[in-house]
Amino acid sequence: MRTERIAAVLLAAGTSSRFGEEDKLMAVLRGKPMAAHVLETVASMAFAELIAVVRPIEFAPVIHRKLDRRGYTILVNDQPEDGISGSIVRAVEYVMPNNKIRGILVCLADMPDVPQTHYNRICLAAEDIRSVVASTDGFSSSPPAFIGRKHFPELLALKGDQGARALLSHGIQIETTGNILHDVDTPEDLPGWRPITPE
């Protein structure tokens, strides 16, 4: 499916509870905040819309500014303790009225190593509004993932931190090479990390 029919949804509202006191999305990786790697890669593609679900601006002012500069519509999840499902629900509620959107590409801000080529593979494997296309490391299904419009009602009923895992496990699986699906949950997951000073 052409990216022009897809809304990219960047999930960046987690509480980073396992990362300690620092905001993991602001941890420096290769010279810039970790989240910047994902938001810039996704913004460089021709999606119908760029949507980011984030914490309130007082908790993540730098991320808000970077997203705004790159043209994202910012949706605030003021209850991040509800888990990833709450963020997905907010994004789907926003997208549903636009019938030109055939599906969403769910991306995680704590997966900084996913290249544009992989996002493209996910989108190209999506055929229509019934499609579900997930990434896999050969063991489990995960984002980045395409979820077609037909499944939006199911997404609106999600609860908790498992997100759309059950739905993704039944979709087309795009296997990755290397460690590109590595997500950062603790400081140890990010070699040489250091907190960034807010602008």
Question: How would you describe each model-predicted region?
Answer:
Residues 140-153, 187:
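Conserved nucleotide-sugar donor-binding
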Residues 2-141, 170-177:
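Nucleotide and nucleotide-moiety/phosphate-recognizing core
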Residues 113, 146, 183-184:
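Short aromatic/basic micro-patch
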Residues 1-5, 153, 157-199:
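Conserved alpha/beta core of the MobA/IspD/sugar-nucleotide pyrophosphorylase nucleotidyltransferase superfamily
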Residues 16, 27, 152-153, 191:
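Nucleotide phosphate-binding site architecture
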Residues 77-80, 94, 151, 187, ...:
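Bulky hydrophobic/aromatic packing residues
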